[in-house]
Design a protein with these regions (language model features):
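Bacterial N-terminal signal peptides
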Residues: 1-8
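Sequence context surrounding c-type heme c attachment/ligation sites in exported
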Residues: 14-141
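Signal peptide processing junction and immediate N-terminal pro/mature segment
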Residues: 10-12
Length: 141
């Protein structure tokens, strides 16, 4: 019995840490974008419950991307990511109170967009042929 337990523990230790690839990042960003846009649309419609649900989902989608940036030693990207997550948390909190202040949540949503834009300015570029966005090659070095 002890031998089986030792073998299981040893095998578990040998299992490599999951890798968050460029394809994973691309997929996360492509699903995150519409959710973030949906936050703004829901706020504009005064649909705070849907906006809150989109904030929660957006945060989940964005948070996992930290592995990509950490694995590449991009501390500035991790800082930008944490800023965006903190702003999403603030918007979630503002949407969780009984009487929601539309101006406050609008300001917080704008601040989330600013955090996204700050990272995208550094790490994203538009393909001149397809017009699709992609990660700058410098982010991979």
């Amino acid at each position: 019995m002890a031998l089986c337990l030792f073998t299981a523990v040893t095998l578990a230790q040998d299992k490599p840490y999951p890798i968050f690839t460029l394809d994973h990042l691309d997929a996360a960003m492509k699903t995150l974008g519409p959710n973030v846009a949906g936050i703004r649309a829901s706020l504009d419609d005064g649909d705070f419950a849907t906006a809150k649900a989109r904030v929660i989902r957006s945060r989940e989608q964005l948070a996992v991307t930290v592995t990509f940036w950490r694995d590449r030693g991009r501390d500035d990207a991790v800082t930008l990511l944490r800023t965006a997550l903190d702003r999403m948390d603030a918007l979630d909190a503002a949407l969780s109170i009984e009487t929601i202040d539309p101006r406050a949540v609008d300001t917080l949503a704008t601040r989330i967009g600013g955090a996204c834009d700050a990272c995208h300015t550094i790490y994203r570029e538009q393909d001149p042929v397809t017009s699709e966005y992609r990660l700058r090659q410098s982010a991979l070095q």
